[in-house]
């Protein structure tokens, strides 16, 4: 990175971006606004039809929004000529779910191609392509054709190709969905390294919560063509506010209770037990919060379910507890959890005689 690159603090800025396709009854994008910080990793999540791919196509200029403003690397796209837009797009690489490598070209040839389109001499393009293939872990695979490469290797070639013209932004659209879990993790590790070593801004579209938690700095939740929630990874994943965010994250954090317990739960207090879900993160995940509660207040607790996981390098854990319902004891528990930075949610009340 040079001084000019470091001077740019915002990679992409979108304001009130809207797009409606001909014949559609509702907009694909409805006044979408966001600031994508430079040199960070951003994940856009949402259900199918939320508008994610349309937004991506607007960011790489494959679609033109009906209204709103789009600024890329401090340049207002609407003020640029077609030629200037083409030059700007050299700094924006796109990786698709289908890698779209040219079957008749080797890995080296595929990575050289974008440079050759810009008139880069073959010798220079070849050296640059070899450097990039080495950077993505494909030294020795330069002469392999796409059919001779695994899915993960083809995706690595696609990443190298996207960086061929020294792209400062990588747009990735469901790029791991066709890969097995281990290969996906390997590709995510590669992207983290590229972000760290090259300072590349990465914007991901994904439905895979594993992708989100592994590498994201910021998360954006889309519904009906708008961002309904956005913020830093831990803020969004550990403290979701919008119902759509909670729905998307349910499979990541919420371990299902047995049906016989769920069916017996009451939303209002009853004589019996109260069930509480706890979410530990950061410092609280390493403290004896439950042991301290029992010592301080002598409350009988049963652990019904538990799980440990991680967000990037941060550990978090979930527990589902059962305790005899008493308003005074419940208030003491909730105060104790809040004091120690533990997110506590009352799941419901289990009538006396129902087994937990």
List each model region and its residues:
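ABC ATPase NBD coupling module
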Residues: 26, 77-93, 117, 122-123, ...
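Conserved ABC transporter NBD signature motif
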Residues: 68-76
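Conserved signature/switch motifs of ABC ATPase nucleotide-binding domains
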Residues: 144-147, 165
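Catalytic Walker B motif of ABC-type/P-loop ATPase nucleotide-binding domains
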Residues: 170-173
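A short, surface-exposed alpha-helical micro-motif characterized by mixed small hydrophobic
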Residues: 212-214
